[in-house]
Amino acid sequence: MKPSERRKARRLAVQAIYSWQLSGNNIADVEHEFLTEQKIDGIDVTYFRELLSGTATKQAQIDELITPHIERPYDEVSPIEKAVLRLATYELTFRKDVPYKVAINEAIELAKAFGAEDGHKFVNGILDKIVGRK
């Protein structure tokens, strides 16, 4: 099965969020860099842009939703897991058209693809708590 355009947009967005977190560059510059330097065929570019800019502009709000569910200092969370959590929390909170099960499953897949060995379990646990399933 081919990945959907939105799945590809999420994958690119989490990489861009990761880059933004580490570089501290302006989010518009990061967006431009990713859209000009990455292969974007088959990607929902509009959704990519929304995920990236929305996550960046709502970062403080998103982090306030995440941090109560983490049992260690937030700055000790790996940057890739933080990027996945921020992206998924943005979708869960601000994209009501995306079913929470889809947002969580996509986040788990992103954590498996980019995160540490058991990073997907950590991401799943936090997101379940955010949506109130635990």
Swiss-Prot record:
It comes from Shewanella woodyi (strain ATCC 51908 / MS32). Involved in transcription antitermination. Required for transcription of ribosomal RNA (rRNA) genes. Binds specifically to the boxA antiterminator sequence of the ribosomal RNA (rrn) operons. Belongs to the NusB family. SUPFAM superfamilies: NusB-like. It comes from the Bacteria. GO terms for cellular component: cytosol. Keywords: RNA-binding, Transcription, Transcription antitermination, Transcription regulation. Pfam families: NusB (PF01029). Gene3D superfamilies: NusB-like (1.10.940.10). This is Transcription antitermination protein NusB. One of its GO terms (molecular function) is RNA binding. InterPro entries: NusB-like_sf, NusB_fam, NusB_RsmB_TIM44. GO terms for biological process: DNA-templated transcription termination; transcription antitermination.
